[in-house]
């Protein structure tokens, strides 16, 4: 898990990176919670997400937003952090030019940034959004949401009430061709204390299903048109 330095839009960004062993290994970018409330790339939820993808032999990157740890710059209320995430994804793609798929996962503030990046980068295949702060930030930009994904929420979350996330999920579920797998963990607070294993299990279950479905779709035979071509009659 080497340390990496990424050239961000406002200076250097500090990251941790694991490179997949397959030359076509898929990639995943992991985004941390709010920088002004102690959020870093070493957050336990972020660490759990990171290692879930490492176990799957993804090439995985997590990094500190501007002004956090050794990353340069200052907090920019989300706008600059979105630019940081875009730069990190550029770096990840440049080191994995043959990646088969691209995933993004974020926790809290990182989930909000990740969903915005999802709207801007059509190459992102799917997402995992943990405790998206639907009561704090505007998610109306997801109109429509371009990809199916997983949302995980704690029922005892004291910072992001579960009903606010359920309302967001219901809105997304009504969009055409989009499936949101919504999982609520009973007794779980915002920081997943004592529930990291349950979170990891939900991510495992969803990723197993999503990757299996993607593989089946890729290997499915092409549809054959059974209708015979029309024969034009001579005048």
Regions found by a protein language model. Give the residues of each.
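Gly/Ala-rich beta-loop-alpha elbow adjacent to hydrolase catalytic centers
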Residues: 106-114
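Short beta-strand/loop motif that positions the catalytic acidic residue
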Residues: 145, 150-153, 157
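Catalytic histidine neighborhood in serine/cysteine hydrolases
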Residues: 172-191
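Acidic catalytic loop of the alpha/beta-hydrolase fold
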Residues: 156-160, 190-191
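Serine-hydrolase catalytic machinery in alpha/beta-hydrolase-like enzymes
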Residues: 6-96
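Catalytic histidine-centered segment of alpha/beta-hydrolase-like enzymes
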Residues: 73, 188-200
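Short alpha-helix in the alpha/beta-hydrolase fold that links the catalytic acid
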Residues: 147, 161-171
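Alpha/beta-hydrolase fold nucleophile elbow
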Residues: 96-107
């Amino acid at each position: 898990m080497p340390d990496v330095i990424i050239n961000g839009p406002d200076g250097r960004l500090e990251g941790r990176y694991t490179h997949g062993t397959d030359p076509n290994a898929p990639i995943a970018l992991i985004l941390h919670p709010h920088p002004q409330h102690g959020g870093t790339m070493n957050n336990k939820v972020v660490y759990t997400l990171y290692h879930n993808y490492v176990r799957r032999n993804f090439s995985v990157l997590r990094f500190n937003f501007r002004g956090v740890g050794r990353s340069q710059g200052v907090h920019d209320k989300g706008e600059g952090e979105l630019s940081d995430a875009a730069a990190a994804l550029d770096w990840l793609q440049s080191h994995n030019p043959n990646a088969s798929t691209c995933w993004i996962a974020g926790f809290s503030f990182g989930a909000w940034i990740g969903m915005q990046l999802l709207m801007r980068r059509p190459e992102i295949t799917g997402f995992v959004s943990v405790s998206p702060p639907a009561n704090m930030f505007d998610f109306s930009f997801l109109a429509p949401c371009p990809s199916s994904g997983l949302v995980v929420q704690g029922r005892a979350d004291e910072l992001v009430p579960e009903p606010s996330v359920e309302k967001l999920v219901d809105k997304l579920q009504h969009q055409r061709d989009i499936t949101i797998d919504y999982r609520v963990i009973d007794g779980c607070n915002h920081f997943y204390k004592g529930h990291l294993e349950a979170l990891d299990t939900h991510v495992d279950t969803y990723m197993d299903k999503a990757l299996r479905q993607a593989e089946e779709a890729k290997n499915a035979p092409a549809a054959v048109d059974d209708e015979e071509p029309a024969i034009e009659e001579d005048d």
